Swiss-Prot record:
Function: Regulatory subunit of serine/threonine-protein phosphatase 4 (PP4).
UniProt-listed Pfam families: PPP4R2
Species this protein is from: Xenopus laevis
Protein name: Serine/threonine-protein phosphatase 4 regulatory subunit 2-A
GO molecular function: protein phosphatase regulator activity
Biased composition, class Acidic residues, residue ranges: 388-403
Annotated region described as Disordered, given as residue ranges: 140-403
Biased composition (Basic and acidic residues): 197-211
Compositional bias of kind Polar residues: 140-149, 156-170, 183-196, 212-226, 371-387
Sequence similarity: Belongs to the PPP4R2 family.
Signal peptide (UniProt feature, chain positions): none
Subunit structure: Serine/threonine-protein phosphatase 4 (PP4) occurs in different assemblies of the catalytic and one or more regulatory subunits.
PANTHER family per record: PPP4R2-RELATED PROTEIN (PTHR16487), PROTEIN PHOSPHATASE 4 REGULATORY SUBUNIT 2-RELATED (PTHR16487:SF0)
């Protein structure tokens, strides 16, 4: 929207003696109703805004007269003229643009959109003007004046406790000039402000509560362990009481038998049946034990027989091995004896030949001496194989002794 044309239109409206509606200014009000942006300052378009508001209220009354029925008992009835003067007085008292300017422009440009009755329309306007906060136009934001304004109150320009943003329609809480900067090391809460002493105290209280809770939990755990111990002791005591009760049951049964003979006879019959069942079970247990012992003995006998058979087989194998070794040694001895016998026979032939040659010249006594020597040699030959055979028979007996 062209600001220069708007300012010229506002100046022309102020210069006119007879106030009339301006299409350019109506377009400005429609722009504010749609966007909420006031291009010019409040004092510049304040006069036209009041004129337009008064005209709309009058038109609304002529087109929609006051209700003829009884008024609402929950609402105070105020005449139209009085309500109109009250509204105009509040609006003319503004020194800044109220922050409800967009809604007020909507009511001025299209008054019958939400209201049909005059009294309701006036109450809607009154509700929107009963404010003190202000809004800035775009030009006022860029070129703010040195005056700190509120609607109804003016502050000097050298005031340091208020800024230009403290532009409210009435007394309010101004903002400080400069916000203090806090270091990052200081603790910050969720709103970006440092934690106060109250927050610190609350943190300390929470820590103390957590410590106390942990101590309580430890005490609870100790209590549970002690309860478990007590429960175990109680169970042991209960078992002891049951054992004692079982011991004292026979005495009680005897007393009951003396008191009630019929009951005692029944109890004795039951005891006899239990004894018979116990004896039968004992007999069955004995039979099972005997069968188990017999099976164990049979298994032991079979194991001993198998070990004896294995030992006999091992002995027979050892005997066969020794016999084979003795036979081999006997054959070796026989071969050696045959070789020695052959050598001896050859020697004898040589000696006999020499003897025959010598006997021809020798005496008969020498012949006898040779005959006796030859007989002795033959005896020694016959004895030597016998000794070898005895040694061979003695040799296999040694491994038997070792086994």
């Amino acid at each position: 929207m062209d600001v220069d044309r708007l300012q010229e239109a506002l100046k022309d409206f102020e210069k006119r003696g007879k106030k009339e509606v301006s299409p350019e200014l109506d377009q400005f009000l429609c722009h504010v109703a749609k966007t909420g942006e006031t291009v010019v300052q409040w004092p510049q378009f304040k006069e036209y805004f009041v004129f337009k508001l008064e005209m709309v209220m009058d038109d609304f009354r002529t087109s929609a007269p006051e209700q003829r029925g009884s008024p609402n008992p929950n609402v105070e009835y105020i005449p139209f003229d009085e309500m109109k003067q009250r509204i105009l007085k509040i609006v003319t008292g503004f020194n800044g643009t109220p922050f409800t300017i967009q809604r007020l422009c909507e009511l001025l440009t299209d008054p019958r959109k939400n209201y049909n009755g005059t009294d309701k329309f006036l109450r809607g306007v009154e509700k929107n003007i009963m404010v003190v906060s202000c809004v800035y136009p775009s030009s006022e934001k860029n070129n703010s004046t040195s005056l700190n304004r509120m609607n109804g109150v003016m502050f000097p320009s050298n005031s340091q406790s208020y800024t230009d943003r403290s532009n409210v329609n009435g007394p309010g809480t101004p903002r400080p000039m400069i916000r203090p900067k806090f270091s990052l090391s200081s603790p910050m809460n969720t709103n970006g402000l440092p934690d106060s002493t109250e927050n610190k105290e609350s943190d300390l209280q929470q820590k103390e509560k957590s410590q106390s809770d942990s101590a309580v939990s430890d005490d609870g755990s100790q209590a549970t362990t002690s309860r478990n111990k007590h429960s175990a002791e109680d169970s042991a005591e209960v078992e002891e009481h049951e054992v004692k009760r079982l011991k004292f049951d026979p005495d009680e049964e005897e007393e009951a038998a003396c008191a009630n003979p019929d009951a005692s006879s029944e109890v004795s019959a039951e005891m006899a049946e239990e004894a018979e069942s116990a004896s039968t079970s004992a007999d069955k247990g004995k039979e099972s034990c005997q069968t188990a012992q017999a099976s164990d003995e049979e298994s032991l006998m079979t194991a001993s027989e198998s070990t004896e058979a294995e030992s006999n087989e091992r002995d027979s194998e050892n005997v066969s091995v020794t016999e084979e070794s003795s036979e081999e040694s006997h054959h070796m001895d026989q071969s050696e004896e045959s070789e020695s016998a052959c050598s001896l026979t050859s020697d004898e032939h040589n000696s006999t030949a020499a003897a025959t040659t010598s006997t021809e010249d020798a005496d008969p006594s020498e012949e006898e001496h040779l005959a006796t020597s030859s007989g002795k040699s033959t005896e020694t030959l016959t004895l030597s194989p016998m000794e070898n055979s005895e040694e061979a028979t003695d040799a296999p007996e040694e491994p038997m002794e070792q086994d």
